[in-house]
């Protein structure tokens, strides 16, 4: 029997089924549409499947990709002598702070240059960004369930707000209450299911033994506003059902681009869908 959690996790296979090809293309299209114009400094704290760093670098941005992990007890290092932008003091001379030998983060030695931008990878605790200076990022990407996997999301969102410059933006994707309730129903946790509408924080056990934090629109707004961020919009990652997408692609295998455009143009209740995508910004500094 297919578990409800499979609605947001692509199968580990060499060739993605039709629906997951659609899901991936929608994710990429939403990210491309959100990315700022020009060249900027971005921080990506997304989960491992998030394509944000790759797409941002292709668009000309410099991206610090924070890879979640517990680094050895060494400080930040110069990544290499290949022209990477880290010099021990900053991301492009301004963003990444050397915290000494306290083990806050470790460069993994890789600086990937795209045709226009670059990705600098750092192994660190992505929920605590002490290695970044205040206001160093023009935008932050927290895709691939970052604020659901980190259960103490208040810590992560506060760190995101701190590193954003005034008027900087954040794009995030979280697991929704709709998904959480479906997972609880699959597991026959009826008592917990009854409590979901009244709970301030909804933590749902996952089939693999992990726990995810699920959100409704009101909880998303409360989380972001608590960190001083203003939510601009909330929308489902996808509105179209897996059965509908699969049926359409079986009938017309070349209709994927058309389906993606239709998905992006579709009006949707912000509480629908297995995942919610959020765009928010940090207020501009008021003149004294």
Q: Regions from the language model: what does each represent?
A:
Residues 43, 48-78, 103-129:
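Class I SAM-dependent methyltransferase SAM/SAH-binding core
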Residues 130-140:
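A short acidic, Gly/Pro-enriched loop at the edge of an enzyme's catalytic core
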Residues 138-153:
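A short SAM/SAH-binding and catalytic strip from SAM-dependent methyltransferases
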Residues 154-169:
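A short glycine-rich, Lys/Arg-flanked "PGG" loop and its adjoining helix->strand segment in the class I
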Residues 203-219:
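Acceptor-substrate binding/catalytic loop of class I
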Residues 221-225, 233-288:
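A C-terminal cap/extension of S-adenosyl-L-methionine-dependent methyltransferases
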């Amino acid at each position: 029997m297919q578990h409800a959690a499979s609605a947001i996790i692509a199968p580990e296979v060499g060739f993605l089924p039709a629906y997951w090809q659609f899901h991936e293309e929608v994710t990429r299209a939403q990210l491309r549409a959100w990315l700022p114009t020009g060249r900027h400094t971005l921080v990506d704290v997304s989960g491992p499947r998030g394509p944000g760093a790759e797409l941002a670098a292709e668009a000309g941005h410099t991206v610090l990709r924070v890879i979640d992990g517990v680094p050895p007890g060494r400080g930040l290092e110069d990544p290499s002598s290949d022209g990477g932008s880290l010099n021990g003091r900053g991301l492009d001379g301004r963003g990444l702070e050397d915290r000494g030998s306290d083990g806050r983060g470790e460069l993994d030695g890789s600086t990937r240059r795209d045709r226009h931008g670059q990705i600098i990878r750092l192994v660190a605790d992505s929920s605590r960004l002490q290695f970044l200076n205040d206001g160093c990022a023009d935008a932050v990407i927290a895709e691939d369930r970052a604020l659901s996997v980190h259960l103490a999301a208040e810590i992560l969102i506060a760190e995101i707000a701190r590193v954003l410059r005034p008027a900087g933006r954040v794009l995030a994707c979280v697991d929704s209450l709709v998904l959480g309730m479906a997972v609880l129903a699959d597991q026959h946790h009826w008592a917990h299911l009854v409590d979901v509408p009244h709970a301030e924080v909804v933590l749902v056990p996952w089939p693999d033994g992990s726990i995810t934090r699920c959100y409704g629109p009101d909880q998303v707004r409360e989380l972001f506003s608590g960190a001083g961020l203003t939510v601009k919009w909330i929308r489902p990652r996808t509105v179209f059902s897996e059965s509908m997408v699969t049926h359409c692609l079986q009938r017309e295998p070349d209709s994927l681009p058309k389906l993606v455009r239709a998905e992006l143009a579709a009006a949707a209740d912000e509480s629908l869908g297995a995942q919610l995508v959020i765009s928010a910004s940090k207020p501009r500094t008021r003149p004294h």
